[in-house]
């Protein structure tokens, strides 16, 4: 079992051991007057840090593979940390990709129809989404789709690397960590 896990781990690490480049989201600064440019710039910098950390961890993993990874605490610690940094990078990309739109969800779209079918109305879904977002603590609220059961679900995810619903596809992501709002909106 241990040999299988090690060989599988090496295979997966090789798949992800490419350099990631932070996406440029500066176009959002002028598209979103309700969020101060300074807040967005700080948030973009934080996101860039996640991208840098993922690349750094990939390099460290490559270096560790030259040693005895089966008993390496360093290798195992890097693997644990990887989920935090990688998921932080991906969740920020999903969040920023959601921002800047000025159009309402098309009532004829499949997503809109699914929301109404499952929640009873679009307003009911918004109410549920906002109630989920008001969960005390830091984290993310994610509208997710379970393709297996064809269900939508508003989920609260506290940490980047704990709590994701792995069979769900994220459709809408909102960052509710303090860095996303506190300097502009305080605790309101």
Task: Give the positions of each predicted feature.
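Sec-dependent N-terminal signal peptides
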Residues: 4-13
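Feature for soluble, non-membrane regions of globular proteins
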Residues: 17-188
């Amino acid at each position: 079992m241990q040999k299988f896990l090690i060989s599988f781990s090496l295979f997966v690490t090789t798949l992800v051991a490419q350099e990631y480049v932070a996406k440029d989201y500066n176009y959002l600064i002028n598209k979103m007057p309700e969020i101060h440019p300074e807040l967005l710039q700080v948030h973009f910098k934080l996101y860039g840090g996640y991208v840098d950390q993922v690349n750094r961890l990939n390099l460290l993993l490559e270096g560790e593979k030259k040693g005895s990874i089966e008993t390496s605490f360093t290798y195992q610690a890097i693997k644990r940390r990887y989920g935090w940094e990688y998921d932080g990078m991906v969740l920020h990309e999903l969040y920023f990709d959601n921002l800047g739109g000025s159009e309402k969800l098309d009532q004829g779209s499949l997503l809109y129809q699914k929301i109404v079918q499952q929640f009873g109305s679009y307003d009911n879904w918004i109410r549920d989404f906002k109630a989920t977002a008001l969960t005390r603590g830091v984290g993310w609220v994610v509208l997710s789709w379970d393709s297996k059961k064809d269900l939508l679900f508003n989920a609260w995810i506290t940490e980047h690397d704990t709590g994701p619903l792995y069979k769900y596809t994220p459709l809408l992501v909102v960052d509710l960590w303090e860095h996303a709002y506190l300097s502009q909106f305080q605790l309101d």
